[in-house]
From Swiss-Prot:
Catalytic reaction equation(s): DNA(n) + a 2'-deoxyribonucleoside 5'-triphosphate = DNA(n+1) + diphosphate
Record's protein name: DNA polymerase III subunit epsilon
Pfam short name (any one): RNase_T
Keywords: DNA replication, DNA-directed DNA polymerase, Exonuclease, Hydrolase, Magnesium, Manganese, Metal-binding, Nuclease, Nucleotidyltransferase, Transferase
Subunit relationships: DNA polymerase III contains a core (composed of alpha, epsilon and theta chains) that associates with a tau subunit. This core dimerizes to form the POLIII' complex. PolIII' associates with the gamma complex (composed of gamma, delta, delta', psi and chi chains) and with the beta chain to form the complete DNA polymerase III complex.
GO molecular function: 3'-5' exonuclease activity; DNA binding; DNA-directed DNA polymerase activity; metal ion binding
Cofactor: how and how many bound: Binds 2 divalent metal cations. Magnesium or manganese.
Disulfide bonds: none
Species name: Aquifex aeolicus (strain VF5)
Binding-site positions, a divalent metal cation 1: 23, 25, 167
GO CC annotation terms, alphabetical: cytosol
Residues involved in substrate binding: 23, 25, 167
Length: 202
């Protein structure tokens, strides 16, 4: 039986293949009560970032002060920006059927799921990998595993963190480091092996 394109991607060494890293900022952490205000994705092909998607999103109401301080995003910046309903089709087209990577990716996917169910009537079903879980397994000696702390450990520039495009770019760079470490030490780099490692079964 012929394999589907998606199953082939999932068996590829991701250092040679294609994946998309996503990140978002929202008005809060409760998915049902919060809305996305900053959405980004970067496509990685053969270990190189080849394309980027980024947009601010108008949430429909004023954002909390703590979110302004965290992200640097203000209400004035969001006025006149597209709504999530307007940007969702372009975002989903950019992501395609690729493997999705994120730092604490489960939270991002919960938000995307909320919107795909609301506006598309279906769940977001792309396979996913979490750099937070993988970094804990691959680099066990780090003191902290926030995106900023991991990035600084590798000498990456972290000015502008907590903006979606910056965070997605840093996550991509960290994931490439994880893939390189796993490939050179253990000869693994496919989705299924990484998923087992996430779950502590490697």
């Amino acid at each position: 039986m012929k394999s589907s394109p998606k199953s082939l991607k999932m068996r590829d060494n991701l250092l040679d293949g294609t994946f998309v890293v996503i990140d978002l900022e929202a008005t809060g952490f409760d998915v049902e009560k919060s809305e996305v205000i900053d959405l980004a994705a970067v496509r990685v092909e053969g270990g190189i970032i080849t394309e980027k998607f980024s947009t601010l999103v108008y949430p429909g109401y004023f954002i909390p002060e703590r979110i302004k301080k965290l992200t640097g995003i203000t209400n004035a910046m969001l006025v006149g920006q597209p709504t999530i309903e307007e940007v969702l089709p372009e975002f989903l087209e950019f992501v395609g059927d690729n493997i999705v990577v994120g730092h604490f990716v489960e939270q991002d996917i919960k938000f995307i799921n909320k919107y795909t169910k609301q506006y598309r009537g279906k769940k977001f079903r792309n396979p996913s990998l979490c750099t937070l879980k993988l970094a804990r397994k691959v680099f066990p000696g780090l003191k902290k595993y926030s995106l900023k702390e991991i990035a600084e450990n590798f000498g990456f520039e972290t000015n502008g963190v907590h903006r979606a495009l910056k965070d997605a770019t840093l996550t991509a760079e960290i994931f490439i480091k994880i893939l390189e470490e796993l490939w050179f030490k253990y000869g693994i780099g496919d989705y299924y092996s990484l998923k087992r490692l996430e779950k502590g079964k490697f």
